[in-house]
Amino acid sequence: MFQTQILVRFGDLDPAGIAYYPNLVNYLHEAFEDFFRGHVGRPYPELYREGLGFPTVKLEVEYHRPVQYGDHVDVAVVVEHVGRSSVRLRYEASVQGRPVFTGRNVVVTVNLKTFETLPVPDWLRERLEAARG
């Protein structure tokens, strides 16, 4: 399992003063990018420049309690499954140990020039399998 932390900024809030729900999806993507940098060992922008992309093809988010301005959201990233060209990840987000939202997404490995599906590269498969939970 990989852990990262995200700070809730003023611009993330809705008129009710809590994090606007689409921003929680952005937090999941930030955790995904942090996972690539911290666990996979390859910054996501580097892979992007090399033409390797991971678009989300399925996304689920379940909200448990409000996320507020100034919260430090701890997000755990767990690899649930590595397929031929897809990866399913689970995200568990909490503030001070209390769950605030959970999510899952499936990403597919693609060539960014053609958007054709590619097999998960062997070097990446090895790193992803090491993070399976």
Enumerate the language-model features and the residues they cover:
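Terminal targeting signals and extreme-terminal segments of soluble enzymes
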Residues: 1-74, 80-133
